[in-house]
Amino acid sequence: MEWAPMNIRAPTRLAVGRVRFYGQHHGEVNCSAFSPDGRTLLTASDDGCVYVWGTKSGRLLWRLAGHRGPVKSCCFSPDGRLIASSSSDHSIRLWDVARSKCLHVLKGHQRSVETVSFSPDSKQLASGGWDKRAIVWEVQSGRRVHLLVGHCDSIQSSDFSPTSDSLATGSWDSTVHIWDLRASTPVVSYHNLEGHTGNISCLCYSASGLLASGSWDKTICVWKPTTNNLPLQLKGHTIWVNSLAFSPDELKLASAGYSRTVKVWDCLTGKCLETLKGMLDVAHACIFTPDGKLLVSGAAVTR
């Protein structure tokens, strides 16, 4: 993992440099996530483990082992009490942060689980994967609440809306589905956002409800999902887009491409503010710290 520090007083320029390198993984880094207070960093690796780091010290706090295949996704619950991880072993694991202990193993997918995301109130968890289905789980009990069927190919990304009443899923069928979770029935309705011409590999909501999606077509779409409006389409990546993250103030959007670069965009104008280079290998993940001062990028580095 690498850190690129940002000068937030000069929003059009970034102070770029490696702050810390995390090199204890024994496989590619597929995902990274900060705790809500910014004190802890998660990394998910092809070696089957989730790594929990102290952000200031850079020290490895825990290595969460239990998956029987590469860990494809990981995230903290918004209340900071839980960690969710998903794997190619078809399962999702819920971990207690305080005790670094696995609380639930959620089984319901038939193939690799590529994405997990918590609802803003930390009460629900969404997952999706190669079986073309998304599942919404009740966190406390591990019970399946909704089975979401409608995509024609693998689901690679998911995120709840800020109000928790809808879920966005991105698929290799080139569409984004917005699922209405207000229904009390297990099966819910959805509508499509169509604008990409390639597999959708990542998406994320902003705090105000904007939705960004990245694709193999090398573009990023920024949507207003409630109106199906597409106010911005960002072009500049030369290879497909792997990861997206809004800054906490929503003025910037970071994107990691399947190359050794991370781009930072102005969310108002669509202009590329900076192209960050210097990754050792493919940039698999990017995320802002909760205070917006640092941008973290994860690469396929195994040493």
Swiss-Prot record:
Repeat is among the record's keywords: yes
Entry-linked InterPro entries: G-protein_beta_WD-40_rep, WD40/YVTN_repeat-like_dom_sf, WD40_repeat_CS, WD40_repeat_dom_sf, WD40_rpt
Keyword presence, Transcription: no
Alphabetized Pfam families for the sequence: WD40
WD repeats: 24-63, 66-105, 108-147, 150-189, 195-233, 236-277, 279-303
GO BP of this protein: hematopoietic progenitor cell differentiation
Domain of life where this protein originates: Eukaryota
SMART domains per record: WD40 (SM00320)
Matches recorded under CDD domains: WD40
Keywords, comma-separated and alphabetical: Repeat, WD repeat
Protein name per UniProt: WD repeat-containing protein 38
Species for this entry: Mus musculus
